[in-house]
């Protein structure tokens, strides 16, 4: 397994973002702001974004708006889009065949970690064959905070300042993070404020 703990605070540290950490917005926002502050390099694929768009549509967002949001993410992180991974999918063995594309994209881009809240479908022993691990969004974000408190707080504060509709203060944003399963991360950030 790669010694990713020493690399995580670097843009060289690559994390594939599974759909379930791109939606809901509270998790996506903090991940995107941490990436903006070069705390890690985000990656995703066409399959992941198509799934994200379907989730948004199921949640009542129009197809046009869903496509607009995915395009904005691709424009904000133009190097995040992983291509030419499809040929790896048939050879991957995971408990849920619908998750094979996530690991294929991770392998293709030499990712260090798959950030997912669906850990049961990404067995660590199997991922280790590819020098990849899987972490929940909460564990991944808490690790980033731990390795670079100063930049993480700067990113968090900018997230709060840019938050619209509704405008929320730091503590309200932290409460939203907790409600979305980022309890450890929110508590860690809270302790640094």
List the predicted regions and their residue ranges:
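Active-site neighborhoods of divalent-metal-dependent phosphate/nucleic-acid chemistry enzymes
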Residues: 78-113, 147-149, 183-193
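Acidic, PIN/NYN-like endoribonuclease modules and their adjacent C-terminal/linker elements
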Residues: 120-193
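Metal-dependent nucleic-acid phosphoesterase active-site entry motif
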Residues: 1-29
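PIN/NYN-family metal-dependent endoribonuclease catalytic core
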Residues: 25-59
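Extended, non-globular alpha-helical segments
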Residues: 50, 54-77, 147-155, 162-163
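Acidic, metal-binding active-site segment of PIN/NYN-like and related structure-specific nucleases
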Residues: 99-133
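Acidic, metal-coordinating catalytic cores used for nucleic-acid/nucleotide bond scission
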Residues: 21-22, 90-98, 120-123
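Conserved beta-strand segments of alpha/beta enzyme cores
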Residues: 41, 81, 131-133
């Amino acid at each position: 397994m790669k010694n990713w703990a020493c690399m995580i605070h670097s843009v060289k540290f690559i994390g594939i973002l599974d759909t379930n950490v791109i939606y809901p917005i509270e998790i996506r926002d903090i991940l995107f702001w941490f990436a903006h502050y070069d705390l890690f390099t985000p990656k995703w694929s066409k399959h992941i974004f198509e799934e994200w768009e379907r989730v948004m549509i199921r949640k009542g967002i129009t197809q046009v708006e869903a496509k607009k949001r995915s395009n904005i993410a691709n424009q904000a992180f133009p190097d995040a889009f992983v291509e030419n991974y499809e040929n790896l999918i048939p050879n991957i063995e995971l408990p849920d065949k619908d998750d094979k594309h996530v690991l294929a994209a991770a392998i293709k881009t030499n990712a260090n970690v798959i950030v997912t809240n669906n850990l049961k479908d990404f067995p660590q022993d199997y991922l280790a064959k590819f020098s990849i691990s899987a972490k929940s969004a909460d564990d991944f974000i808490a690790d980033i905070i731990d390795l670079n408190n100063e930049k993480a707080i700067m990113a968090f504060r900018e997230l709060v300042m840019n938050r619209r509709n509704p405008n929320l203060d730091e503590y309200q944003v932290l409460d939203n993070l907790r409600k979305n399963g980022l309890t450890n991360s929110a508590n860690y950030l809270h302790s640094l404020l």
